[in-house]
């Protein structure tokens, strides 16, 4: 996916860009920053990790993992909608509440991409190496943003990113989980 993003930049004749990546997008942005730093002017890494499977970093919250397991079983029973809604509700944090209509809209957006979305997403993350020991090589101004209640990417991942990238700043959003609701747009963009 990093190669796809770089190919798109080349096609659009974008020589240098500010990269913003959330979750897996943050892993993609790190990959680009490490492999082609000359095309990156700055980074914003949101709710992401330098190595989701790195043993030196905290694992996802067991309650969230239980929800993912239950969701996987629901998907096997061909109930992807209920599975996604359950996972989403487990990952939002306590600062904001979501009504079922908003969650339903999000499901419809994801569902438009096909039934194997979660499987492909998980496979891609599984194949991404840990960048924890390479963060020092990122010499690009970076903003790291994470929720204090992210059950998938615990807060120590954000601290690791911020401490590993010398030109970085960390912004922690209190009470926010892995999902970034619309109400945070102004806070994040400022």
Label for each model-derived stretch:
Residues 1-17:
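Conserved acidic catalytic loop of the alpha/beta-hydrolase fold
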Residues 17, 21-23, 147:
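Conserved alpha/beta-hydrolase "nucleophile elbow" surrounding the catalytic nucleophile
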Residues 26-37, 43:
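Short glycine-enriched nucleophile-adjacent loop
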Residues 41-75:
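Flexible "cap/lid" loop of the alpha/beta hydrolase fold
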Residues 63-133, 140:
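Alpha/beta-hydrolase
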Residues 138, 144-146, 150:
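Short beta-strand/loop motif that positions the catalytic acidic residue
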Residues 149-153, 178:
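Acidic catalytic loop of the alpha/beta-hydrolase fold
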Residues 167-190:
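Catalytic active-site module of serine/aspartate enzymes centered on a nucleophile-bearing elbow/loop
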């Amino acid at each position: 996916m990093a190669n796809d993003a770089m190919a798109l930049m080349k096609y659009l004749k974008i020589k240098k860009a500010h990269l913003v990546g959330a979750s897996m997008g943050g892993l993609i942005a790190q990959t680009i920053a490490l492999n082609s730093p000359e095309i990156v002017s700055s980074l914003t890494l949101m709710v992401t990790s330098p190595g989701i499977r790195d043993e030196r970093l905290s694992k996802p919250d067991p309650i969230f993992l239980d929800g993912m397991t239950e969701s996987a079983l629901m998907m096997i029973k061909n109930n992807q909608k209920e599975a996604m809604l359950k996972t989403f509700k487990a990952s939002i944090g306590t600062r904001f509440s979501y009504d079922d209509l908003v969650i339903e809209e999000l499901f419809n957006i994801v569902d438009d991409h096909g039934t194997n979305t979660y499987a492909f997403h998980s496979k891609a993350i599984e194949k991404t190496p840990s960048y924890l020991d390479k963060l020092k090589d990122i010499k690009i101004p970076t903003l790291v943003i994470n929720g204090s209640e992210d059950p998938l990417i615990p807060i120590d991942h954000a601290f690791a990113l911020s401490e590993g990238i010398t030109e970085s700043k960390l912004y922690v959003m209190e009470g926010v989980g892995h999902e970034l609701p619309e109400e945070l747009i102004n806070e994040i963009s400022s």
